Amino acid sequence: MDLKYSASHCNLSSDMKLRRFHQHRGKGREEEYDASSLSLNNLSKLILPPLGVASYNQNHIRSSGWIISPMDSRYRCWEFYMVLLVAYSAWVYPFEVAFLNSSPKRNLCIADNIVDLFFAVDIVLTFFVAYIDERTQLLVREPKQIAVRYLSTWFLMDVASTIPFDAIGYLITGTSTLNITCNLLGLLRFWRLRRVKHLFTRLEKDIRYSYFWIRCFRLLSVTLFLVHCAGCSYYLIADRYPHQGKTWTDAIPNFTETSLSIRYIAAIYWSITTMTTVGYGDLHASNTIEMVFITVYMLFNLGLTAYLIGNMTNLVVEGTRRTMEFRNSIEAASNFVNRNRLPPRLKDQILAYMCLRFKAESLNQQHLIDQLPKSIYKSICQHLFLPSVEKVYLFKGVSREILLLLVSKMKAEYIPPREDVIMQNEAPDDVYIIVSGEVEIIDSEMERESVLGTLRCGDIFGEVGALCCRPQSYTFQTKSLSQLLRLKTSFLIETMQIKQQDNATMLKNFLQHHKKLSNLDIGDLKAQQNGENTDVVPPNIASNLIAVVTTGNAALLDELLKAKLSPDITDSKGKTPLHVAASRGYEDCVLVLLKHGCNIHIRDVNGNSALWEAIISKHYEIFRILYHFAAISDPHIAGDLLCEAAKQNNVEVMKALLKQGLNVDTEDHHGVTALQVAMAEDQMDMVNLLATNGADVVCVNTHNEFTPLEKLRVVEEEEEEERGRVSIYRGHPLERRERSCNEAGKLILLPPSLDDLKKIAGEKFGFDGSETMVTNEDGAEIDSIEVIRDNDKLYFVVNKII
């Protein structure tokens, strides 16, 4: 992602599909809302990408080339038409065999052949229809894979059910009356009924249709089909029975001479009364075959009744429990929308979200994952999410251990189009990583909204608010169906603190990334106020404020300082951001730091101020700026700089200072001039340089009653008299008492700073003073020289983090 901002407007780089601000009011946003992206027609055809899959084509609804998408509206119309032909075949074939004496009328024969022709076309068409792999849930469009799958599954049965056995029998025998073999082979046409089952299954999950009426129609269809088949079979037995006068049809006078419709109605009447266990007895079995058939039929009815009354209840409640809950939630949501008169945009968003959640439950299986051991759960998260997390700029170069900790706490979510994932100015509770889909960045100002750009696979958002502990700067809204990984901000911060090296790497990535966004306005940063001191800033950003100055990003530095981050924070060498900016020549950063009230007089562990860093680095413009501010608060600043240059015998720096207009006879805080220091140190080159530039050589020996060297010694003696004496010991006081340590301490004069005290202790005891902690006799840590009194006992603890 690459954002470029200017004072008047924002432009986005090409890799984010830049476009100018298009501003519109909130009401206009609803009016311009694209309903097609949330169309219920399209929602019923969505295929969710598997977890962790980024490169997934969401244009699967449309067919391309020779391959037909199973979700294509035209193909679904074809499927519905084929279901109507299946219903025709299922009704006509038993009727022809039973009532037309296996000699169908010419019109029905033509219709049957036309229907078979359509099914033959469908067989050919199936070789070009993509399918959803049951294992990966991906849409397979490869022609070879489609052909292999079809040939290895339903191809043979589809061909067998399409063969016109009656026409073949007529060609072989020369008669239209078919034998029992052809009749049995014709039963293969019932194989087509699976299409009806698939249609009902799909319609039950389509929220555009009433689930109740779809289920009722499905049960009614099953019942009527079985009644029709049983009636035709019962009539067929009577019609083919060799002994006329001994069949159930004899109960109706002149039954064989009545019309075809009367005979069919009588057969259906018997079938229904028998199925419903009414059994009036007017049409009863008259021979053994009929008795056997009725017995079998009654036994079958027992199972069918149990299916309709008992098992179907359990099947609907248990087998379709998720669907029922889904439909109930849809109905409740619709009632809620209507009752509260919500706009159509919100209604579609609610329904779209609920549909996607229903579909995503079968992919997430979170309830199953929660039951697994932690080790297996981590392995699953590693396999699903780690490749996506490794692409994120924030985690470049981070150790695998930290990445595994992060992915173990990530949750996958599917978000529908036009859904606000993060709202502007909301608390930074979560960070999101985009696995698939697109997310728009929207800046809301009053009632105006500006689309700044688009984030895609591998991008992260919400991290600025999380790491800077401030409200979110923008609204992040999905542009298309998106799979996101959600990570709690609190866990991200905790994980960053586990390993200091990884913490520094992530913050470095963060700062370098936003350096590319050179004028990035990250909003009015604010420190968290949860009952804590508001002056305390988050360590994960404050400790790396110097890194911002190192990049020279004055705009980001300004925004961070607005968040009340201290401009005087120091690194391990005591350098402040002003030291770094002055030494590197970043004038803009220097001006920003001065604007936020930084302390110009802070010195690092070597005693160097930012002014000294600027002059030795030859950044004279920065030196003049700093000197102007420093001279206002400290009239001796010029003398201090000249004396420091004289003490170090740095002729080049002395020349540079004099060129900047500093008075060569200016005294430092101790009333000593640079010439006096040079003479005391016996540095003749420096003395000659100062004398050449007009230093007052007369007052050098007439100043009071001392020579320059004597005066320095007198000053040092006076300072020593003012300082107290302290006893220093090595080790923690509690540990020394536990070990009954009798190691003697050392009595020293209290130096002016805590760093000097540590340095002296290191020289006395032979350790690195910068890596120690100073405590009193009770073990309380001392972090200021002002709290130390005369005759205090101080203890130095080595290798402790300060």
Curated annotation (Swiss-Prot):
Places the protein is found: Endoplasmic reticulum membrane
Domain KHA: residue ranges: 725-802
Description of post-translational modifications: Dephosphorylated by PP2CA.
Extracellular topological domain: 101-109, 175-183, 240-265, 286-288
Keyword Transport included in the entry's annotation: yes
Keyword Methyltransferase annotated: no
Gene3D superfamilies associated with the record: 1.10.287.70, Ankyrin repeat-containing domain, Jelly Rolls
Intramembrane positions: 266-285
Broad class of where this protein is predominantly found: endoplasmic reticulum
Gene Ontology, cellular component aspect: endoplasmic reticulum membrane; monoatomic ion channel complex; plasmodesma
Tissue-wise expression: Expressed mainly in the phloem tissues throughout the plant but also, at a lower level, in leaf epiderm, mesophyll and guard cells.
Glycosites: N179, N254
SMART domains: ANK, cNMP
Keywords: ANK repeat, Endoplasmic reticulum, Glycoprotein, Ion channel, Ion transport, Membrane, Potassium, Potassium channel, Potassium transport, Repeat, Transmembrane, Transmembrane helix, Transport, Voltage-gated channel
Molecular function terms, GO-annotated: identical protein binding; voltage-gated potassium channel activity
Assembly notes: The potassium channel is probably composed of a homo- or heterotetrameric complex of pore-forming subunits. Interacts with the phosphatase PPC2A and the kinase CIPK6. May interact with AKT1, KAT1 and KAT3. Interacts with SLAC1.
Known function: Highly selective and weak inward-rectifying potassium channel. Plays a role in both loading and unloading potassium into/from the phloem sap. Seems to control sugar loading into phloem via a voltage-dependent process. Blocked by physiological concentrations of external calcium and by external acidification. May interact with the cytoskeleton or with regulatory proteins. Dephosphorylation by PP2CA not only leads to the inhibition of potassium currents but also to an increase of the voltage-dependence of the channel.
The protein's name in its UniProt record: Potassium channel AKT2/3
Source organism: Arabidopsis thaliana
This protein's encoding gene: AKT2
